[in-house]
Swiss-Prot record:
GO molecular function, one term: retinol binding
Residue numbers binding substrate: 118
Key words, A-Z: Disulfide bond, Retinol-binding, Secreted, Signal, Transport, Vitamin A
Cellular component GO terms held in the UniProt record: extracellular space
Range of residues in the leader sequence: 1-20
Record's protein name: Retinol-binding protein 4
Subcellular location, record wording: Secreted
């Protein structure tokens, strides 16, 4: 009997440590330390993404982050969308970034060039990047009462339209797990449907 109780206590302790290790409250997610927006600027290609609720870019997504003369960060993105379940087209999105106390945590005000496309003000957190190969971003649109995210989206970006090297993929997978989004991403194809230049 004592062995069973001891085994149960060990199992409960292990379970508790696993749950504590995977804390999915948004405020506990780590972002890029010492983020440098000048190094981050330029063209990034989405190679994977976790979708939010609502109409969103599907594939062939390229984003261009720019530092304006006044120091503000802006972005344009282009990608394929499907409207009314039938019509497919390449859509342009425009974003303006509002800086916060943490350089890697922006608020992004965005809108589509077409009125039917999404518009809003979302978090835009740079979770990790090496500036030359990969970047992973995260946004939580709505939170649950317990602080976890109810509606989020995330992009894995590459400087190379053909994807990420295996070493970068391993880093990105670890970060996806830390965001509690492991196995929630889908591959973003680049088949020439939209111009990326």
């Amino acid at each position: 009997m004592e062995r069973k109780v001891l085994g149960l206590l060990i199992a409960l302790g292990f379970l508790g440590s696993c749950l504590a290790e995977k804390n999915c409250r948004v405020d506990n997610f780590e972002v890029m330390k010492d983020f440098n927006k000048e190094r981050y600027a330029g063209v990034w290609y989405a190679v994977a993404k976790k979708d939010p609720e609502g109409l969103f870019l599907l594939d062939n997504i390229a984003a261009n982050f720019k530092i304006e003369d006044n120091g503000k960060t802006t972005a344009t993105a282009k990608g394929r969308v499907r409207i009314l379940d039938k019509l497919e087209l390449c859509a342009n999105m425009v974003g303006t970034f509002i800086e916060t106390n943490d350089p890697a945590k922006y608020r992004m005000k965005y809108h589509g060039a077409l009125a039917i496309l999404e518009r809003g003000l979302d978090d835009h957190w740079v979770v990790d990047t090496d500036y030359t190969t990969y970047a992973i971003t995260y946004a939580c649109r709505r939170r649950n009462l317990d602080g976890t995210c109810r509606d989020s989206y995330s992009f894995v970006f590459s400087r190379d339209i053909n994807g990420l090297p295996s070493e970068s993929q391993r880093i990105v997978r670890r970060r996806q797990e830390q965001l509690c989004l492991d196995r929630k991403y889908r591959v973003v194809v680049h088949n020439g449907y939209c111009e990326t230049n």
